[in-house]
Design a protein with these regions (language model features):
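Active-site acidic/histidine proton-transfer and metal-coordination neighborhood
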Residues: 79-96
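Oxyanion-binding "anion nests"
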Residues: 96-130
Length: 172
């Protein structure tokens, strides 16, 4: 009775399908929403709406990307103190959320400009598996480096040498 299982991963849904005795465990399994959204709705039954910041977290975590502010909020949070000890968690009103979005928009603009410069300096057109592609020697952690040229190439390749091995990421 003291256990509440809240999850949004496909493997958990499959586990319940394979072990029907788990159906009786109190909680919610729903792949459409993030665990943050599921936890909020579980503990705030009857709430008129889910706070916007939780909607943004859910949109990002489930890769839905339906909300216009999702990426900006993510990068704004990355540029903030979001540690467990941070006071931020006590003050996430819609106004604070929008301030974080504005901060993230600045971060995204910086990334956009840096990506263009990096592609110009370290990118080159080549062929991969019969496809014309853009390759770039980069340690970037995101496919966003290719955003300015995404529609020009069917395949983009990011690669780097770590000193021990080559790492490759393919984007289509």
């Amino acid at each position: 009775d003291n256990l509440v299982w809240i999850d949004h991963h496909v493997c958990s849904v499959q586990l319940v399908e394979q072990h029907l005795e788990l159906v009786s465990v109190k909680g919610v399994l729903d792949m459409r929403y993030s665990a943050a959204a599921l936890v909020y709705t579980w503990f705030h039954k009857g709430a008129a709406r889910i706070p916007y910041w939780i909607q943004l977290v859910s949109d990002y975590d489930t890769w839905a990307k339906q909300l216009v502010d999702t990426d900006a909020f993510n990068y704004g949070m990355l540029a903030s103190d979001w540690s467990v000890e941070s006071d931020l968690w006590e003050s996430l009103t819609d106004d604070v959320t929008m301030n974080i979005v504005r901060k993230g928009e600045s971060v995204l603009e910086y990334i956009k400009q840096r990506s263009k410069s990096h592609l110009k300096s370290y990118g080159f057109v080549t062929e991969f598996a019969g496809y014309k592609c853009l390759a770039v020697n980069s340690r970037y952690e995101s496919s966003m480096i290719f955003d300015s040229v995404r529609n020009q190439y069917p395949v983009c390749v990011m690669f780097e040498f770590t000193g021990r091995c080559w790492k490759y990421s393919l984007y289509t």
